[in-house]
């Protein structure tokens, strides 16, 4: 059974982010299932630090992007998801290619969501783990 409360297509989701940080970083929503959603991002001049490695802050931006989107898609109309906390552990460097972030729920309640975001490289090696907590505000 799906957790998604909104009807969407990947094209619609990618259109939403094209003129903001999501688009500038090259983040693309790439796949979803009944209780997970993924985004991919290039490791290139936009996303690396001066030593040519994926910037840790950009990994966190990717995690917050896909986790916040997951929260938005899994709440009812008349609610908004607001970030309360995010943390990340950077496990291995990435020099090139793409990384993929997959968000899955840890806990979904009426007022709080906790999402696990795993970021993997093209060899499916875990590069970063992140946890995002969202406050669900009822309008």
Locations of regions flagged by a protein language model:
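Terminal targeting signals and extreme-terminal segments of soluble enzymes
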Residues: 1-139
């Amino acid at each position: 059974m799906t957790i998604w409360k909104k009807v969407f297509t990947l094209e619609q989701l990618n259109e939403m982010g094209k003129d903001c940080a999501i688009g500038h970083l090259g983040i693309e929503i790439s796949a979803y299932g009944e209780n997970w959603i993924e985004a991919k991002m290039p490791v290139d001049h936009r996303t690396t630090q001066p030593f040519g490695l994926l910037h840790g802050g950009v990994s966190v931006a990717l995690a917050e992007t896909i986790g916040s989107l997951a929260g938005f898609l899994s709440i009812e109309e008349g609610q908004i998801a607001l970030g309360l906390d995010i943390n990340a552990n950077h496990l291995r460097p990435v020099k090139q290619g793409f990384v993929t972030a997959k968000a899955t729920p840890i806990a979904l309640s009426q007022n709080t969501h906790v999402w696990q975001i795993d970021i993997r490289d093209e060899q499916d090696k875990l590069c970063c783990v992140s946890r995002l907590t969202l406050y669900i505000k009822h309008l």
